[in-house]
Structure formats: C-alpha cells, structure tokens
Amino acid sequence: MGSIEIPNCSGSIVYKTISDFIDFPDHEQKLWWHSTAPMFAEMLRVAGYDLHSQYKILGIFLNHVIPFLGVYPTRINNRWLSILTRYGTPFELSLNCSQSLVRYTYEPINSATGTVKDPFNTHSIWDALDRLMPLQKGIDLEFFKHLKQDLTVDDQDSAYLLENNLVGGQIRTQNKLALDLKGGNFVLKTYIYPALKALATGKSIKTLMFDSVYRLCRQNPSLEAPLRALEEYVDSKGPNSTASPRLLSCDLIDPSKSRVKIYILELNVTLEAMEDLWTMGGRLNDASTLAGLEMLRELWDLIKLPPGMREYPEPFLQLGTIPDEQLPLMANYTLHHDQAMPEPQVYFTTFGLNDGRVADGLVTFFERRGWNHMA
C-alpha cells in the first residue's frame, strides 16, 4: 500500500474535525482523504466559504466522491490511468480566482473499470451520478444521456476495439464529472471524450461531436446559431489544420439553461495561434473581445510560453517525476442559448514550466489591474 505525508495546510480545523470521526471502509479511501482533503479544506477557507458550507462540501467529497477514485496511486500499483492529469490521477482541484469559486473534477472509477466487464470505463459514471443526484436539486441528465449515447462506446463497440487491438496507447478516458461549488450547493458538469468512439466507428471526432450537438438542437434550436458559427470557423481552417476538436462538456441542469462547450486542441503554440482561437479567425471583433485580446497579449508576454509545435505526449508520466514537456494550446467555445456566436475561453498551458516564473507573471498581471486580493 502507498503511504502519505500530510501537507502543511492540515491545520484546517474542518479537516481535522472530520478526520477524527471517520471510519474508513478501506485503506485506499483513507489515503485519498488524507492526501487531498487538507488542500481542499484550505482552498475552501481561503476562498471564503462559511464553516457550514465547508463541512457540507467535504462531507459530500468524503462519502460520495472518494469511493469512486479507485486505488490510491503509487509507482508500482496497477491502476486506471485518467486523462485528467499527466500522471493519470483521477482527481483535480481548481480555483476560479475572480469569483472565489472552488471546483473539482474527477473521473469516476469502480471495481469493474478496466476489467472485461467495463474495459474502457463506460459505465461507472452512472453509479457516481446515482450518488450525487439525491444531494442537489435541479440535476438534469437529458443532455448527458444524449451526448453519452452518441460519443462513448457501448459494449459492442468495446468488444470490437478489443478484438481488433485498435486502442493501443490511446487515452481511454471517456467521461468525467465536475462540481462547481457555490456555497454549500454544487452545479454538476460532465466532460466527454469521443476518441474511442471515433476509433470504433471510423468517424472523426469532429464529425461525431458536431453531429451529436446538431441532433441536440432539434429539441433546443436556440443553440444552433452559435454551433453553426463554430463549425464554419473549424472547417475554414482546412483538413491539415493544427487545430482540431477534442472533447465537449455540458451543464447537468435544465436543458433550457444548460450550456454546451466544445474544446479545440491547437498544436501550434504561438501567440498568433492563440489570437486566432480567441477571435475565431477575426469573426469575433466586438469591444469586449478586443479588450480581452489585449489582455491575452499582455499575459502571453508575462508568462512567455515557449513557441513551437506540441503533440499531446504519450504515455503518462511516472508519479514523482519532474515534467520536462510542454502541452499544446486549448480553447473552448460556449454555446449559449439565443446567442449568435459562441463565447471563447483560451488556456495558457503552463504545465512543465517553472512554477515561480508563472506565478510572478500572474502577480504582475493582477497587480496592474488592482486585483491585489488575487495577487
């Protein structure tokens, strides 16, 4: 079994209090709790969540999420490798600084994951949803059921992929969940990766994703205009483009309010490529977009991403190794109901860069705008 060291932030009274009363069902869950909860608790405290919300959020995480994280990762154990991190770990915390909102993402894993019963982890997400749905009002699975059926492999697809040895080193993650924590409540989201479905059907990821969302638009026509605008932009880049659709996400709420996001991976890491993603090749030219473009250029200059062509690396990194690689760029485009154009969001992929240099760049960026609470 693995062992852990409690991080310095373990002084959180909430983490310590909950830990005093836990009767863990197995050692794996104990390791997961003590390696993630101290940082989780500290992030909630720093972000200003009240004490009641902190206890509720950590209680949900302990009882309804940790049981779906699988075996605790070590360098020697056999475990499911998730696309969520370059080390294959299935859990990640994040913080929306401008809104002081904590969120976490995980790929649900159960005992059948990676076995002949569920070789590509298609089914465990349903068990995870069964645990979460009674905890939060307003969860709606209409979009999820539609997209999952179209974009993840079924048992017949799985058998075909295995019999023909088609997967190889292909990343096997197909779906994951995210919780945006708003007070003591949460908004549930899903992310879906169609790469295995593309292998099984012979269709491109782009075709699978856009066709599925177009079918979704039959019942939700208010999403069609931004979808068509995005497809026109993607198609305009041509068949040899370094940018291609990779995954999509949606909110698991009332379909009339749910947003769909389509993610584009860009192998060409340059400021010009990021500017093109941000403006959709000049299609977005309103005042807000242009103001954001100037901020993007400033941040690029501060962080100094090394330019070049970057393939998504294989295989996963060994636990404990220091990364010596750079990832491609990524952008997502949010399809809002009744809006003509999608809303862009670009990612500065700083993985593998010096953390201190990146932090210094962000501090400078925040201070220039008077966002001292974020710096």
Curated annotation (Swiss-Prot):
Keyword annotations: Alkaloid metabolism, Transferase
Reactions catalysed: L-tryptophan + dimethylallyl diphosphate = 4-(3-methylbut-2-enyl)-L-tryptophan + diphosphate
Binding site for substrate: R103, K189, Y191, R259, K261, Y263, Q345, Y347
Residues bound to L-tryptophan: I83, L84, E92, Y193, R246
Pathway(s) where this gene product acts: Alkaloid biosynthesis; ergot alkaloid biosynthesis
E.C. designation(s): 2.5.1.34
GO biological process, one term: indole alkaloid biosynthetic process
Top EC category: transferase
InterPro entries named in the record: Aro_prenylTrfase, Aro_prenylTrfase_DMATS
One Pfam family per UniProt: Trp_DMAT
GO molecular function: tryptophan dimethylallyltransferase activity
Quaternary state and interactors: Homodimer.
Purpose of the protein: Tryptophan dimethylallyltransferase; part of the gene cluster that mediates the biosynthesis of fungal ergot alkaloid. DmaW catalyzes the first step of ergot alkaloid biosynthesis by condensing dimethylallyl diphosphate (DMAP) and tryptophan to form 4-dimethylallyl-L-tryptophan. The second step is catalyzed by the methyltransferase easF that methylates 4-dimethylallyl-L-tryptophan in the presence of S-adenosyl-L-methionine, resulting in the formation of 4-dimethylallyl-L-abrine.
Similarity annotation: Belongs to the tryptophan dimethylallyltransferase family.
Entry protein name: Tryptophan dimethylallyltransferase
Source species of the chain: Trichophyton verrucosum (strain HKI 0517)
